[in-house]
Amino acid sequence: MRTVTVGTRGSTLALAQTRWVVARLKEEWPDTDFRIQTISTKGDRNRESLEAMAQKGDKGFWVKEIEDALLQKRIDIAVHSLKDLPTEQPEGLEVASIPKRVDARDVLIGKEGMKRLADLPQGARVGTSSVRRKAFLRAYRPDLQVIDLRGNIDTRLAALAGDEYDAIILAAAGLIRTEMRHRIDEFVEPDILLPAPGQGALALETRSGPENDLTIEVAYAIHDHGTDDRITAEREFLAGLGAGCMAPVGAHASIKGGVLTLEGWVGALDGSKVIRATSIGDPAECADIGAELAGDMLGQGAQALIDAARE
């Protein structure tokens, strides 16, 4: 029996989504033994705020050690939250498969009487670790107190039970994958808050080259083409901006009636300025749509906002 070692971070969410991937792969390859290996990353060990890391321009915060394990042949497939994966892979690696995306939206969880973002009282304390969410909140509701909140899902939910936070904002996908959908009070629609590029999707990364064709074939068995088109548009937009996964950038692509619509957002960290635009086209031209939108927004001054977030 062939053995395939699947690498992942060791958080509750990372393990939940990796077990989901392995279950899908096992359905396609019942004669293969899949083994999960957990790997600690810099993001797991570093307690700095993501805002501080963004200012340093760090990339691969959550994935580098896992990619190193791939290159060193200690694992065969890596499972990542796609929003954490830089837009360029190291030489010798490739994204072999993107499974079907779950909900891309952000969600709000609040204390009694604080269940909707628009209804939060003036001065309410909202916790999030995301640079993008902080920039959005400061622009959308400058009257709110935006407070840093890092940690896994359980840690963040426990923090909400204390006195420091009135509400927190998380990715819907994490709560859905860890079977905590019932904790969600409000789904924040993309027309209000655009998610991170690739949010809600997973990436299966492998070594590239013909000697790895069989492993690539194993991973590709659960690839979803519709998700791939949407993700490609979002990530080409991010790449065209020259921004990383910790920049104050949002993007969301949808396909309806054979037309792909990509919305993009870039904001100042202090909420003083936002740029938002849309590009549409044939899903087959998803990469060009993303690049076109990036060019449009750079022409509107997006670069200055991205650069300021690094200072």
Swiss-Prot record:
The modification S-(dipyrrolylmethanemethyl)cysteine is found at C245. It catalyses: 4 porphobilinogen + H2O = hydroxymethylbilane + 4 NH4(+). One of its GO terms (molecular function) is hydroxymethylbilane synthase activity. Its cofactor is dipyrromethane. It comes from the Bacteria. Pathway: Porphyrin-containing compound metabolism; protoporphyrin-IX biosynthesis; coproporphyrinogen-III from 5-aminolevulinate: step 2/4. Its EC number is 2.5.1.61. InterPro entries: HemC, Porphobilin_deaminase_cofac_BS, Porphobilin_deaminase_N, Porphobilinogen_deaminase_C, Porphobilinogen_deaminase_C_sf. One of its GO terms (biological process) is protoporphyrinogen IX biosynthetic process. Keywords: Porphyrin biosynthesis, Transferase. It is an enzyme of class 2 (transferase). Pfam families: Porphobil_deam, Porphobil_deamC. CDD domains: PBP2_EcHMBS_like. One of its GO terms (cellular component) is cytoplasm. Binds 1 dipyrromethane group covalently. HAMAP family: Porphobil_deam (MF_00260). Monomer. Tetrapolymerization of the monopyrrole PBG into the hydroxymethylbilane pre-uroporphyrinogen in several discrete steps. The porphobilinogen subunits are added to the dipyrromethane group. Belongs to the HMBS family. This is Porphobilinogen deaminase.
